[in-house]
């Protein structure tokens, strides 16, 4: 339940609007509410970090509004809370009216949900599951440059899970669609909330089975096998893609060094 922020309230402040985050001095605001002109604003407590509350404030600031990507290199827990705040802010902004009857809605006091008093419909934040997979062939890993990454970054393959599809089926389909190869020995590794805008990345490792690389030009600029000790520009630390690549490199080193 939200509350009015008082002068001596302190903590971490997620000030968000339209999927943007207020980052004065390039950092998440931390400290007394009075120091950030937040006294009197409505805020929702969305978690705790290092023993202090994390507050969500639905507000636009004229300056220093940026992407949550700018805090990705901070601690994973803090990045996750920042992502939660941005996703919740967008959820509340986009669910002011009921999609069934058109009447105004209001936030639930007990959970992350919006309620319609007219038809009693209940809405929850939508989460889009995605798969991301590192594919190994002997001492090499399959890396691709995506159409949306024209800065030279090469990463592992990923894609959204379709309706009525298992995670395993999504891996096989996405890999085939984007690269033209088949994989085997799929193994789940980890997951990562990814607020761009509302994804949950489910990470896997797999082994090459068969086929030659044939890229989908609508998705990829190029794809190739890279030996573990001769890699191109990689995604930044803190991303699950980087974790998968580093784990694959570690396995290759153990076998081939």
From Swiss-Prot:
Q: Which cysteines are joined by disulfide bonds?
A: none
Q: Where does a divalent metal cation 3 bind?
A: 174, 178, 219
Q: Under which EC number(s) is this enzyme classified?
A: 3.6.1.-, 3.6.1.22
Q: Which PROSITE patterns match?
A: NUDIX (PS51462), NUDIX_BOX (PS00893)
Q: Where is the Nudix hydrolase domain?
A: 125-248
What cofactor does this protein call for?
Answer: Mg(2+); Mn(2+); Zn(2+)
Enzyme superclass (EC): hydrolase
What are the binding positions for a divalent metal cation 2 in this chain?
174
Residue numbers binding Zn(2+): 98, 101, 116, 119
The similarity comment for this entry is: Belongs to the Nudix hydrolase family. NudC subfamily.
Please describe what this protein does: mRNA decapping enzyme that specifically removes the nicotinamide adenine dinucleotide (NAD) cap from a subset of mRNAs by hydrolyzing the diphosphate linkage to produce nicotinamide mononucleotide (NMN) and 5' monophosphate mRNA. The NAD-cap is present at the 5'-end of some mRNAs and stabilizes RNA against 5'-processing. Has preference for mRNAs with a 5'-end purine. Catalyzes the hydrolysis of a broad range of dinucleotide pyrophosphates.
The name this protein carries in UniProt is NAD-capped RNA hydrolase NudC
Q: Which organism is it from?
A: Salmonella paratyphi B (strain ATCC BAA-1250 / SPB7)
According to the entry, what is the taxonomic lineage of the organism? Answer: Bacteria, Pseudomonadati, Pseudomonadota, Gammaproteobacteria, Enterobacterales
**Which gene codes for it?**
nudC
């Amino acid at each position: 339940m939200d509350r009015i922020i008082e002068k001596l309230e302190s903590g971490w402040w997620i000030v968000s609007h339209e999927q943007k985050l207020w980052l004065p001095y390039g950092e998440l605001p931390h400290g007394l509410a009075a120091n950030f002109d937040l006294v009197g604003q409505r805020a929702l407590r969305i978690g705790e970090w290092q023993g202090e509350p994390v507050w969500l404030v639905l507000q636009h600031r004229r300056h220093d509004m940026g992407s949550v990507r700018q805090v990705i290199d901070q601690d994973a827990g803090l990045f996750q809370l920042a992502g939660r705040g941005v996703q919740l802010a967008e959820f509340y902004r986009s669910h002011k009216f009921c999609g069934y009857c058109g009447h105004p809605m209001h936030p639930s006091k007990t959970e992350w949900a919006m309620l319609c008093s007219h038809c009693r419909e209940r809405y929850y934040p939508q989460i889009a599951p995605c798969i991301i997979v590192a594919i190994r062939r002997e001492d090499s890993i399959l890396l691709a440059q995506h159409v949306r990454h024209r800065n030279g970054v090469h990463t592992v393959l990923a894609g959204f899970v379709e309706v009525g599809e298992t995670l395993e089926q999504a891996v096989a389909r996405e890999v085939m669609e984007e690269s033209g190869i088949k994989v085997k020995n799929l193994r789940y590794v980890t997951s990562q909330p990814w607020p761009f805008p509302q994804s949950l990345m489910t990470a896997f490792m797999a082994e090459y089975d068969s086929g030659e690389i044939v890229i989908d030009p609508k998705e990829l600029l190029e794809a190739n096998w890279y030996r573990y000790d001769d890699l191109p520009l990689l995604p930044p630390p803190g991303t699950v893609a980087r974790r998968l690549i580093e784990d694959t490199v570690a396995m290759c080193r153990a076998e081939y060094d």
